[in-house]
A protein has these predicted regions:
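Positively charged, small/polar-rich N-terminal and surface patches that mediate targeting and assembly
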Residues: 1-117, 123-168
Length: 168
């Protein structure tokens, strides 16, 4: 079973600071990172900056399409017109098919705001107590997460994985 987690930080650079800790956990085989992305939202900006993470030791990237669609749904709906907003609203229902429910989306929208940042990780096989203990040594964070069933994870990989065929 995979977990999609957003590690929310009270500073715009907290997510970047946590990367070394997360990579150390991966090297110690305490967590298996499938894919990840960072959102930074400087206080003087209307919209956040997003960046997909590329690490050769992560097991299998979902690709930019997944992160682009997720971040569009999470952060850019307030900035688009009603017609596009309605289409993205329908997309929210589609994400629930992958185990990314309305509660996860709502919490991220409410908590990742100007002046904050978030490290988004899709992980599996975490040794939870050791991961939580290691993260206590980094910047203060709040965890927002949702668990995916094996079927939902497979569906995500099929739809958005690097090996996925292009849809017309």
């Amino acid at each position: 079973m995979a977990t999609l987690a957003a590690f929310k930080f009270d500073t715009a650079d907290g997510a970047e600071q946590m990367l070394d800790i997360v990579e150390g956990l991966q090297k110690q085989q305490l967590i298996d990172i499938i894919d990840g992305a960072i959102v930074t939202w400087p206080t003087d900006k209307k919209k956040p900056k997003t960046k997909q993470m590329y690490h050769t030791n992560w097991t299998g990237a979902l690709g930019g399409a997944f992160w682009g669609m997720l971040f569009g749904l999470l952060f850019f709906i307030p900035f688009v017109g009603l017609a596009i907003g309605a289409a993205l609203g329908a997309l929210a229902g589609h994400f629930s098919d992958y185990g990314i429910d309305d509660n996860f989306i709502k919490q991220v929208r409410e908590k990742v705001t100007p002046g904050t940042s978030a490290l988004f990780l899709l992980t599996q096989n975490a040794v939870t107590d050791k991961v939580v203990d290691a993260m206590k040594h980094g910047p203060k964070l709040e965890v927002i997460s949702t668990n995916l069933t094996k079927e939902q994870e497979d569906k995500l990989r099929e739809e958005f994985g690097e090996e996925a065929p292009a849809h017309a």
